[in-house]
Amino acid sequence: MEPPKGDTVVKTEVPVKDPSLSVVDSKTKGVEDANTEIALSDEVEIETKGSDSTPVKAPSRTSSGSKKSVHWSPELVSGSQEPDQKAASSSSAGSNPYIARSPAETSDASLKDTMETVKGVLGRWGKRVAEAAKKTESLAGNTWQHLRTAPSFADAAMGRIAQSTKVFAEGGYEKIFRQTFETDPEEQLLNSFACYLSTSAGPVMGVLYISSAKLAYCSDNPLSYKNGDQTEWSYYKVVIPLHQLKAVNPSASIVNPAEKYIQVISVDNHEFWFMGFLNYDGAVTSLQDSLQAGALRSV
């Protein structure tokens, strides 16, 4: 008699005595609700129909040589699961109050949106890097040109270091501006730019201040001049109220484009040439804004 599909068959040629097994007479075979038949022989083979399990050999035991039938509980055969299956079933049951599930978005639209976001971030980052590199290159070029404008490269470098030390010691350009020039209480310093002013004696290093009321320039160091037979020293200063501004003209040398200038013209046609800016573009923008502000005041 062939056992039903899915049942377990055990065969052995050595009789086994096991008190835990329920022994029944062969006449009652088929009457009991048994799903498993064990034939006692010398070698035990356990095979499960419908599975890929390899037959397992059990150790032989000595006993009488009679054939006996043994009944197993159906729950012991069909009720067990593999550990992974148990974990999966308990997880899917939702009995753990600390576990939550949300569906993963795997649609093409979601993937496309993610890629577009990444492209946008990388694009903005690339533009910022390019702008920073351009500004760094411009600053390096302006610094080199600033130092070259002076009659002595070494003197220009030392003068710039001395000016920076002075600004730090005095507490910033705002205090130096108010100490150097007459100002109104409501007047505000908007910007300051290290540069040179072209004079009959050559380029003079100094700082151009742009306030809410005027343009003001002062040399970093005092200049010598003759007063009769005596030599005197004084700082070179230029002050132009905003309402007296007529034009601001940026330009560059045809021979050497790195040499950039800003021409400032007053309403009474006095011209002032500034050059060697560390921040040329910023100076042009600030001066043009001041020109517009002065034009509005004069109306």
UniProtKB/Swiss-Prot annotation:
Tissue: Ubiquitous.
Polar residues bias: start-end ranges: 78-95
Chain intervals for the UniProt region annotation (Disordered): 1-112
Domain GRAM: start-end pairs: 175-252
Pfam entry (one): GRAM
GO biological process, any: regulation of epidermal cell division
Transmembrane domains' residue ranges: none
Annotated Basic and acidic residues bias: 1-16
Cellular component, GO annotation: vacuole
Alphabetical list of Gene3D superfamilies matching this protein: Pleckstrin-homology domain (PH domain)/Phosphotyrosine-binding domain (PTB) (2.30.29.30)
Family (UniProt): Belongs to the GEM family.
Quaternary organization: Interacts with CDT1, a DNA replication protein and TTG1 (TRANSPARENT TESTA GLABRA1), a WD40-repeat protein involved in GLABRA2-dependent cell fate decision.
Entries under PANTHER family matching the protein: GEM-LIKE PROTEIN 2 (PTHR31969)
Protein role: Involved in the spatial control of cell division, patterning and differentiation of Arabidopsis root epidermal cells. Could be part of a complex that negatively modulates GLABRA2 and CAPRICE expression via the maintenance of a repressor histone H3 epigenetics status of the GL2 and CPC promoters.
Protein name: GLABRA2 expression modulator
Species assigned in the record: Arabidopsis thaliana (Mouse-ear cress)
